[in-house]
A protein has these predicted regions:
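Short coil turns and loop connectors of transmembrane beta-barrels in diderm outer membranes
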Residues: 138, 169-171
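Periplasmic polypeptide-binding modules associated with outer-membrane biogenesis and secretion
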Residues: 1-150, 154-156, 162, 176-187
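Residue-level signature of outer-membrane beta-barrel architecture
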Residues: 165-167
Length: 189
C-alpha cells in the first residue's frame, strides 16, 4: 500500500521480445544510435515533405555538420550547432529531441522546426540519419499604431511607427526601433 509509510511502489516491468508481425520469431529490441545530422535551412512546410523535393543550391560543413541552404545562409552555423541537444553517436532519446525543438523555438529568426529521423540504408537498421529542417520567419517588419485618448475631457492622439529586424547579425538577434509622437489638447487654459 503506497498510502502508508514509504510512499513508494515496487514495480517490475517485463518487456516481451519484439515481433515485426504476429507469426515472426521474437527478437531483441533495437537500440537506435544517431548516425549523421544534417541541417536544411530553407524548408517550406507548404511543399511536399519528401527530402527529394527540397530545393538546395549550396551547402557548407561546420564541425562535421552538413548545412544545406537555398540562396543565402541566414543564421551563423555556430547558432545552429549550439542549439542542437544531441550528437552523432548518441543513443536516440526523445527528451533530447524535445529540448532541441525548445531551443530552436526560442530563436526569433525561425518560424518552424521539423526534426526527422530515417533508418540508414547501408544494412545497419539501428543507425538513424537526422534531418533538422528549419523554416525562417519574416526577417523585417514595420508596424504603425494610432491611439486616441480622452482624460477628464482633454482630447489627445498618438501615433507610433516601429521597425523590427529579426536577424541583423545572423545570430537570431532582434533589433527594434520605435518612434512615438503624441499631442493632447488641454481645455480650460
Amino acid at each position: 500500500d503506497t498510502a502508508r509509510n514509504t510512499h513508494q511502489v515496487d514495480l517490475t516491468l517485463h518487456l516481451l521480445p519484439y515481433k515485426t508481425y504476429v507469426g515472426d520469431t521474437p527478437k531483441e529490441h533495437f537500440q537506435y544510435k544517431i548516425n549523421k545530422i544534417n541541417f536544411i535551412t530553407d524548408y517550406d512546410v507548404l511543399q511536399s515533405s519528401a527530402l527529394s523535393s527540397i530545393e538546395i543550391n549550396d551547402s557548407l560543413h561546420y564541425n562535421g555538420f552538413p548545412i544545406y541552404y537555398k540562396d543565402k545562409l541566414y543564421l551563423r552555423p555556430k547558432v545552429l550547432v549550439d542549439n542542437l541537444r544531441f550528437a552523432s553517436g548518441d543513443l536516440y532519446d526523445e527528451r533530447n529531441v524535445q529540448k532541441t525543438y525548445t531551443y530552436f523555438g526560442r530563436l526569433s529568426a525561425l518560424k518552424y522546426t521539423n526534426i526527422r529521423f530515417f533508418e540508414t540504408q547501408n544494412g545497419d537498421s539501428t543507425q538513424l540519419n537526422c534531418y533538422v529542417m528549419l523554416t525562417k520567419s519574416k526577417h523585417k517588419s514595420i508596424s504603425f499604431e494610432l491611439e486616441g485618448t480622452n482624460s477628464a475631457g482633454d482630447l489627445g492622439a498618438a501615433a507610433s511607427v516601429s521597425f523590427q529586424h529579426r536577424y541583423l547579425f545572423r545570430g537570431s538577434e532582434t533589433f527594434m526601433v520605435k518612434f512615438r509622437g503624441a499631442y493632447e489638447a488641454i481645455s480650460g487654459l
